[in-house]
Every structure is written in C-alpha cells, then in structure tokens.
Curated annotation (Swiss-Prot):
Protein name from the UniProt record: Uncharacterized protein C30G12.4
Species for this entry: Caenorhabditis elegans
Annotated SMART domains: C6
Length: 258
C-alpha cells in the first residue's frame, strides 16, 4: 500500500493506490499551486525516505492503468532533529506493502524546508503541484530588523514668528512687562506668552483685544505664563479642548488682596 498525505490550502488531499481500488477525485486543472506547508512528525530518515520513494515509483509503475502512475520526488534537507522510523524491510517492499513508509504531513510544531513535486498521471490532464516552504523552528530565535524612523515636523508648525503676536498694554491699565518667549516642542515652534505684575499685584492676561484670557489667569500669580503652539502658521492657545488663534496679548494687574 502506497500512501501520501499532504495539505493544500488547508484541505487534506489523499493520493493512494490501494490494491485494485481507484480514487474518485481527479485533478483536471493545469494550474501550478504554490503554498506554504507545515510539516511535522516525519519519522523517516533520509535513507528510509529514499527507499519509500523508490518503492512508490515501483508500486505505481506496476499498476495496470497508466493514468494511475505517480512520480514523487521529495527533497528534505533535514534542518531539525527528526526521529527516524525503522527502515522498511525488503519483504514489505517486494510485496508492495508500504504502510511503514507512509508520510504524514500535518499542521503541528515543526516545519522543515521541503519541496514536493507531484505528477498525478493522465486524468484528462496533468497537474503539477509545487509546494515550497521556509524552514523555521518554534524554539528558534526570530530576528527582526527595524529601520530607524525620522520624525519631520510639518512645515505648518515651523513657520510662525514671534512678530505675529502684538503685545500691548490694556487701555487705561497700568504698564507691566509683557513678553513672548520662543521655544520648540516635538519639533514644532512654541511661544510662551508672559505677563509680570508689579510687587503686591497679580497679573492677568487678555487675548485679541480683551476677548478672554488663558486658564492660567485663575492662578492669580504675580507672573502668568500661557503656552501657544505653532499650528498651520498661526499661534494657537489650547485649554479645555478649546483652541484659539492668538494675534494680540495685553497684560493687566490688580492688587493682591492677600
């Protein structure tokens, strides 16, 4: 008995010659299929495999119908430790009983590099199936190479200038120091807006001609700092999920009651 088991696209296909019986499934496509196959539990040595192949050729060459001839060529570079099965006794080869030489291909724990070339007779046509796979081992070390990445800031966050914000005293207020301090964060430009009050006073800031100030005003400190980020060429202040473009900053102070 000659039996070969293989998996093609996750479906098991059995090619066998059992006495005078014939398989009912015929291959009619001439398409060459390339697929990755997991191969486990071969349990045959290189020498035994060679014997089985020779015996298989002999078995199928003695069939009475030429369409049931099968040529099997199997090349296995034994890259892993494989437990050899005892050699097929000559008597079994002579009697065409190849049960001990059967190969079982299954999805399991070990894969070996293999090439399996099957020519399945003249069932109306010839199908050539080529299966190739890369050797791996579940206990081996996989090396992954990661190319270095360079983060380049978008042009829109590097094109702002401090002159885009006008610092002015609020009308009727007391003159206090105002400033814009340039900086960078994650490759983008920043501008720290600063108001400093006189001794005994706390500062507060207004944006865009008294259109409201930053959340930092609640600190009621002598110095207030608010950070603006360059976004699409504009200075933007964000607080509480709300963003505003800032073009003007005015600083004020009030007596510190404490």
């Amino acid at each position: 008995m000659c039996r070969v088991f293989t998996y093609i696209h996750t479906s098991a296909v059995r090619l066998s010659a059992l006495g005078a019986s014939r398989e009912s499934t015929f291959f009619k496509s001439r398409t060459a299929l390339i697929h990755t196959v997991n191969v486990a539990n071969f349990h045959v040595s290189r020498q035994n495999c060679r014997r089985c192949l020779d015996a298989s050729r002999h078995c199928f060459s003695t069939r009475s119908r030429t369409e049931e001839r099968l040529l099997l060529q199997l090349s296995i570079p034994f890259l892993h430790q494989i437990s050899p099965k005892p050699a097929c006794p000559p008597s079994s080869l002579n009697s065409h009983s190849f049960e001990c030489c059967s190969l079982t291909f299954s999805y399991s724990y070990m894969m070996v590099s293999c090439k399996l070339l099957l020519y399945y007779g003249t069932f109306s046509s010839i199908i050539s199936i080529v299966l190739s796979c890369v050797a791996t081992s579940p206990t081996g070390t996989v090396t992954t190479t990661v190319a270095p990445t360079t983060t380049t800031a978008a042009t829109g966050c590097t094109s702002c200038t401090a002159s885009q914000v006008t610092f002015a005293q609020s009308g009727g207020g007391v003159q206090i120091d105002t400033a814009g301090i340039p900086g960078t964060a994650a490759g983008c430009l920043t501008l720290t807006l600063t108001c400093t009050a006189g001794t005994g006073n706390y500062a507060f800031m207004q944006f865009n001609n008294n259109q409201g100030g930053p959340a930092e005003n609640q600190d009621m400190g002598m110095t207030i700092n608010a950070l603006a980020n360059c976004v699409d060429g504009n200075w933007v202040y964000t607080s509480g999920g709300v963003s505003r473009i800032v073009t003007q900053v005015s600083c004020n102070q009030a007596p510190n009651a404490g």
